[in-house]
Regions:
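A glycine- and Lys/Arg-enriched "phosphate-lid" helix/loop adjacent to the NTP-binding pocket
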Residues: 89-148
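Hydrophobic anchor at the beta1->P-loop junction of P-loop NTPases
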Residues: 7
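P-loop (Walker A) phosphate-binding loop of NTP-binding proteins
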Residues: 10, 22
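Post-Walker A alpha-helix
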Residues: 18-19
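Conserved glycine(s) of the Walker
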Residues: 14
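Conserved substrate/cofactor phosphate-moiety recognition/catalytic segment
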Residues: 23-62
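Glycine-rich phosphate-binding loop used to anchor ATP phosphates in small-molecule kinases
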Residues: 54-104, 119
Length: 148
């Protein structure tokens, strides 16, 4: 049986640290891929365009389909793209909605809370702490609306 478990949350809220710990314990984990895409697309602003979201969404769908028998952990999921599209005032493509409906993860989602004491910016983390809080709230809403 395949279990796909999501760990999500705003930027710099500890998701990747949790994923790294799970990897150390031998679990199959799928990394956050936004950083890689930000580097390749040379993005220098916290505003993400639809091309960025499309690229990230496709890679997250690929990761979903590449799950192995057993427990698989995901540093974010396809649903995160829906939250980011909403925040950036983009219309959510119908194909994104359909893929999210047809590719279900485990019903329990772990969402990390933004933590100002550990919050740092870098070349790929371009959102402010305030932005992180807005993203956190948007993520919660998207997952609730999707019945997680």
């Amino acid at each position: 049986m395949i279990k796909r478990i999501i760990i999500t949350g705003g930027p710099c809220s500890g998701k990747t640290s949790i994923i790294d710990g799970l990897k150390d314990e031998g679990y199959k984990c799928f990394n956050e891929i936004s950083r890689e895409v930000i580097q390749k697309m040379n993005i220098k602003t916290s505003y993400k365009n639809i091309d960025f979201e499309e690229t990230v969404f496709k890679k997250r769908k690929r990761d979903f389909l590449n799950a192995k028998i057993g427990v698989n952990f995901y540093d974010r999921s396809m649903l995160d793209n829906l939250a980011y599209l909403k925040i950036n005032n983009h219309e959510i493509p119908t194909k994104f909605k359909i893929d999210c409906e047809n590719h279900r993860y485990h019903p329990t989602v772990f969402i990390t809370t933004p933590w100002e004491d550990i919050y740092t910016l870098d070349d790929e983390r371009l959102e402010s702490f305030k932005d992180s809080m807005q993203i956190f709230e948007a993520l919660k809403q998207v997952y609730i609306e999707a019945n997680y």
